[in-house]
Amino acid sequence: MSLVAIGINHKTATVDLREKVAFSPDKIHDAMKSLASRTRSGEAVIVSTCNRTELYCNNGDETDIIEWLEEYHGLEHQDVAPCLYNYHGQEAVRHLMRVASGLDSLILGEPQILGQVKQAFVKAKEAGTVALTIDRLFQNTFSVAKKVRTETEIGAAAVSVAFAAVSMAKHIFSSLSTTKVLLIGAGETIELVAKHLKDNGVASMVVANRTLERAQSMCEEFNATAITLAQIPDFLPKADIVISSTASPLPILGKGMVEKALKQRRHQPMLLVDIAVPRDIEPEVADLDDAFLYTVDDLHSIIEQNKASRKEAAEQAELITEEQSHLFMEWVRSLESVDSIREYRSQSMAIKDELVERALNKLAQGGDTEQVLVELANRLTNRLIHAPTQALTVASRQGDLNTLGQLRTALGLDKN
């Protein structure tokens, strides 16, 4: 078995490239089936978030997987390859465990990524691209992530990209008690944003979503107003802060719409935070004098503060992922030994069946019973000891004392 993890994230690539290799929710099912067809085991999971796209495969060729990624998105090798990272075996296992535990996140220890990895796993099972090894890998990973959160302080005062977005808003506006916020999207990230905003006493919130029912459901919890995406132009001029995170393949807010809203606001400043990949807000909005546009790549100062405060907890968590990845690989190796044992037993049984059948034929032809049984025992013994005898002979001739010692131990020759 050969586990491979290939990916791109916020540390290796800009948001421009990340959005080009991202997989939209409506296409990821077919993408996983396509990727799995390029592996020998048919096992593959794609984790695609605003900060990373990662491919986890069992028995896949690294070069072939990279070619698949480039072909799928229509990208040139020289544009993608320098930003990719890859892990094999235990390092691939440990990387997934670190990702799910929040140790590789833009904001150290953020809990949202675990839910995203779980969702990717569920989609892979629905696509039929999960078998024994990948299933065990992800189930173990979820247990490790839980262990990290319960046994370390990595989850204390848990933060996320949503937390960072609200922290930036607090930094720009001295108080949120008089600010009006427009949230675009109604997914998990925006729900976290709404929670942080409510905790900080924001004056009012409006939630715009493609599906009004989903927005209304969320608004009940946060005493907010729900609108459709088509109503955004009417509410945008009233917003001091706009935070957007949808799965839209095209921008939701264009420069023209924001420019018109700023004129209606008499050029009062507007903070826009785009935490979606692909981006929800056209980059050209940043050219407007009274618009202050930030993306996930602009949150580094908050992230660095977070990393510093959690360094000790992260070190403890790293030890857990190292230990657990080692244990998982022991299980993988045990599977390989099971296959070897099964093959050896099958081979031995085939020899036994062949010789017993030959002995029975001789008895049926009137052969002497004692002579037939002795011959059977001798032939069976010689056939079964042939392979280990050859191995002992080769090790002895080559002076390979280490192998010779291991063979003697395995054959029980040193017990007396």
Curated annotation (Swiss-Prot):
NCBIfam families: hemA. The active site is at residue 50. Its EC number is 1.2.1.70. The record marks 95 as: Important for activity. Catalyzes the NADPH-dependent reduction of glutamyl-tRNA(Glu) to glutamate 1-semialdehyde (GSA). Pathway: Porphyrin-containing compound metabolism; protoporphyrin-IX biosynthesis; 5-aminolevulinate from L-glutamyl-tRNA(Glu): step 1/2. It is an enzyme of class 1 (oxidoreductase). This is Glutamyl-tRNA reductase. HAMAP family: Glu_tRNA_reductase (MF_00087). GO terms for biological process: protoporphyrinogen IX biosynthetic process from glutamate. Possesses an unusual extended V-shaped dimeric structure with each monomer consisting of three distinct domains arranged along a curved 'spinal' alpha-helix. The N-terminal catalytic domain specifically recognizes the glutamate moiety of the substrate. The second domain is the NADPH-binding domain, and the third C-terminal domain is responsible for dimerization. It catalyses: (S)-4-amino-5-oxopentanoate + tRNA(Glu) + NADP(+) = L-glutamyl-tRNA(Glu) + NADPH + H(+). Keywords: NADP, Oxidoreductase, Porphyrin biosynthesis. During catalysis, the active site Cys acts as a nucleophile attacking the alpha-carbonyl group of tRNA-bound glutamate with the formation of a thioester intermediate between enzyme and glutamate, and the concomitant release of tRNA(Glu). The thioester intermediate is finally reduced by direct hydride transfer from NADPH, to form the product GSA. The keyword NADP applies. NADP(+) binds at residues 185-190. Homodimer. Belongs to the glutamyl-tRNA reductase family. SUPFAM superfamilies: Glutamyl tRNA-reductase catalytic, N-terminal domain (SSF69742), Glutamyl tRNA-reductase dimerization domain (SSF69075), NAD(P)-binding Rossmann-fold domains (SSF51735). One of its GO terms (molecular function) is glutamyl-tRNA reductase activity. Substrate binds at residues 49-52, 105, 110-112, 116.
